[in-house]
Amino acid sequence: MEFLRATASREVDVNSGWGYGSGVERGFLCEGDVRACLVPASHFVRAGTAPGTTPGTAAACLFVPPYVLGVTPAGTLPFGLPSQSVLGGLRLAPVHASSLLEGLGATIFFRCNAP
C-alpha cells in the first residue's frame, strides 16, 4: 500500500511531466516524491476517473477543507481506507472518485493511482 507522507512540502507545477491534463490547478511534491493535485470535485464527477489513470480505475481522494490546504500537519495516511482517518488531528475521508457529490464545489486533495 502506498502512503502519502504529509510533511513540509513545496508547491510544484504538476502539469509538467506527470500527465494529469487540464483541470489541475496546482500540486505539492511531498516527502518520498509522492505527488498530489488540487482539482475541483466536480471535475471527477464528470470524468469518472482521475486524469492520468486508466479509464475505469479510481483515484484515492481526500476531502480537505480549503482553509487547511497547504498547511496539513505532519503525519502518514494510507490511501484507500474505507473509514475516516485522522491525519495530524485533522479528520480526512478517503473516498472513491465516483462517490463525490456533483455540485459540491469542494476542492479535494488527492493522489492518483499508480499508472
Swiss-Prot record:
<protein>
    <recommendedName>
        <fullName>Uncharacterized protein TP_0128</fullName>
    </recommendedName>
</protein>
